[in-house]
A protein has these predicted regions:
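Short, basic/aromatic recognition patches
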Residues: 2-6
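Nudix hydrolase/Nudix homology domain
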Residues: 9-13, 41-44, 49, 119-131, ...
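Short beta-strand scaffold segments in enzyme catalytic cores
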Residues: 15-20
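Short acidic-glycine loop/turn motifs at beta-strand connectors
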Residues: 21-26
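Conserved Nudix-box catalytic region and its N-terminal flanking loop in Nudix hydrolases
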Residues: 27-146, 154
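A short coil-to-beta-strand element that immediately follows conserved catalytic motifs
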Residues: 155-165
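Beta-rich nucleic-acid/ligand-interaction surfaces
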Residues: 165-171
Length: 246
């Protein structure tokens, strides 16, 4: 008989870009704002939602933005799903659709859940570094560059690899035990000026995204990042800054 007492943790990897520019005294880092919060995506992808208790439901929903909570409460499922999954990949689309629809339908079948969530305090959508899932056989650096191009509009010619930096690994225990790997890059014209693509946008830009996953991108100092990034990402950035001085 198999021993089911221990939970098996499946590692999932995402690859991203820690993009920076400027000199040592005035270094800026590019962070992006997700269109959808991690909690909102997790709600529609989670298995066994029918086993959730009220405490866990509230823990997930508190990570929504106010707009996302309103969408869950008042929008029809197909409208939410079309907005959430803009790239319909054959094979995975139907599986994700069925799971997401089950979660939505089950939530609305529970009048106590709906009432409980109507006045839940929500958060702002988090800032972070551009990241995405690696494809089969794809090199991590190629994945990072592809994600940066798809989500923010930067092409490979605009950036070069940091000469001494290896990928940074950090864990997010709250999101499917996923391991994020940030690949360090900087603009080809660094440290003297920003790439041409940003010169007309000043500090905050509207992303030229083809996937609609990202709302905004912004160059921030280490100090500014403290107010925008989650604690684990801020720590990652701080450790990178103090251990990789030019």
């Amino acid at each position: 008989m198999k021993d089911h007492s221990k939970k098996t943790i499946i590692q999932k990897h995402s690859y991203g870009v820690l993009l920076f520019t400027g000199n040592e005294k005035d270094r800026k880092y590019l962070i992006v704002q997700n269109r959808d919060s991690e909690s909102f995506i997790y709600f529609f992808l989670a298995w066994n939602i029918e086993r959730w208790n009220e405490h866990y439901l509230l823990k997930v929903v508190k990570g929504f933005s106010r707009d996302e909570l309103n969408r869950l409460l008042y929008y029809p499922f197909d409208l939410i799903y079309t907005d959430l999954y803009v790239n319909h990949v054959k094979g995975t689309y139907q599986r994700q659709y069925n799971r997401a629809k089950f979660n939505y339908t089950y939530f609305h079948s529970r009048a106590d859940w709906v009432k409980l969530c109507q006045n839940v305090p929500t958060t702002e959508i988090k800032w972070g570094f551009s990241k995405g899932r690696i494809e089969n056989g794809e090199h991590p650096y190629n994945c990072a560059i592809r994600e940066l191009q798809e989500e923010v509009g930067i092409v490979e010619n605009d950036i070069v690899l940091h000469p001494t930096m290896s990928p940074i690994h950090y864990r997010n225990e709250k999101l499917l035990f996923r391991t994020f790997v940030n690949v360090c890059l900087f603009p080809a014209e660094c440290p003297y000026q920003l790439p041409v693509i940003y010169q007309q946008f000043a500090n905050t830009i509207r992303c030229m995204s083809v996937s609609n996953e990202i709302l905004h991108a912004r160059w921030v100092s280490l100090e500014e990042s403290f107010f925008l990034l989650p604690t684990n990402l801020y720590r990652l950035l701080y450790e990178f800054h103090i251990t990789n001085r030019s």
